[in-house]
């Protein structure tokens, strides 16, 4: 258990175990019925919300949204997932179950695993949940499960904060949590008002409680409430429904192809995300294959430098790091190598920064931990002279191979050597013309072309996108001519473990250099700074910078060094309906791409967003314009 707790770490639930049933020490109540918790969940939440029939009748390529007021052990979620599979056995119909749940005191991973051992029939699903369970830090965590058919949005924090900041409309509510007499904050009128705000005609709810003030508060918000027999020895429970004169159905994902311009890691991740939701994608790039630009290196480190203050910017970065680690684990053994990663405090400035970072923040150890020089040496498998931060769930990626793997999907069609000349709106479609005369048509277009996005995206007269290219040169070190670490090591430069006889180190940061070819000076800079970071690397004296191999790529950065994902603003001068931007990922594209692809796919498909409104503002597109526009 975490002691001396500071943000962003969440206080985990303290459990008392009695005959295998977890009870909250804080609230003095059990998480599920001692008689049969699974049967209780099915009776109270699944059957009383009419979910079996509603799941079965849901259209292909549609989605269903359930919101819950207390995640607890995840039993309600797993039972609902199992019911979804029972009613929708065709895993190719591309319907999606969104399950949104809030938890103020989340279970520690070991407690979650122990609690779910009681349900052997749910074990395959429980195992997938456990393997994807996020670190206990405050914020919104999206878990993509069941091959993409199940999307769990798990909010660690206060229920009112979560409902105020999330954008979704629920089809059904599970009003769980502990009894109103034991956990009154969960049942405040403000919380019930938010339940109504996230509902629509036809939305249903169910709760184990039958307390009068809860029933009256929900009725005052417009729900038609009823008392029905409770489960087991419980006499009564409540159900409710917002009245409607007609059936309400969720929007279905369109069957028109979406064109994505740019086949780097951002475009590839988005193409894969949309394809797995049943959206056909045409992926176009000016190069002859994917990952030809900034995503073309043989090795890339998965890391961010988290801020000393846990503000919105830091929360977004932490959320992206955690999501990317979960995302890539699906491809472990293909292009993802979870070696772990060390961030060394190799300079006086970084030592001071890490000291202040550790004084002001607490992170769970499965996300990051402070290590001494001796501990860092043991982890790296080579002498390290300074302390640092250890990220056990990070590692390195083969970016070019990742791009190729991600776009290998039957719903993705690729068009290479497609050098975009114009992007114009004609007859309710966007027409993308290439310089060789070829053209593509689509109602929706995503520009994910790095720093070239600025010349491709339609903008109002007199406007331009505040994007800039930053040259980065990496150097390939022969493994036989130096000592290499067992894990990724980062500082002023980064160094990857050996792979296929070499390791990539770098990269330079050249704001005013447009040379596309590697230079001896760039290699020498990488070597010199690597020797300062890791003297024990023992680079052979016969290695000459002019004889080393390497690669140059141009990262795309915004004016504020924050990424961009969302629809292009429209000030009514020209129609930009259906044009989206995904760019400005900078040197951390491997971290940003999975989360922002998920968020943008949510927006495009009109599904609940994985980012709350506060974090979504950090990536909005309007801030890129010289005179900011609203989206």
UniProtKB/Swiss-Prot annotation:
This is tRNA 5-methylaminomethyl-2-thiouridine biosynthesis bifunctional protein MnmC. In the N-terminal section; belongs to the methyltransferase superfamily. tRNA (mnm(5)s(2)U34)-methyltransferase family. It catalyses: 5-aminomethyl-2-thiouridine(34) in tRNA + S-adenosyl-L-methionine = 5-methylaminomethyl-2-thiouridine(34) in tRNA + S-adenosyl-L-homocysteine + H(+). It is found in: Cytoplasm. Residues 261-631 are annotated as: FAD-dependent cmnm(5)s(2)U34 oxidoreductase. Its cofactor is FAD. The gene is mnmC. Its EC number is 2.1.1.61, 1.5.-.-. It comes from Marinobacter nauticus (strain ATCC 700491 / DSM 11845 / VT8) (Marinobacter aquaeolei). Its main location: cytoplasm. Keywords: Cytoplasm, FAD, Flavoprotein, Methyltransferase, Multifunctional enzyme, Oxidoreductase, S-adenosyl-L-methionine, Transferase, tRNA processing. Disulfide bonds: none annotated. Residues 1-243 are annotated as: tRNA (mnm(5)s(2)U34)-methyltransferase. GO terms for biological process: methylation; tRNA wobble base modification. GO terms for cellular component: cytoplasm.
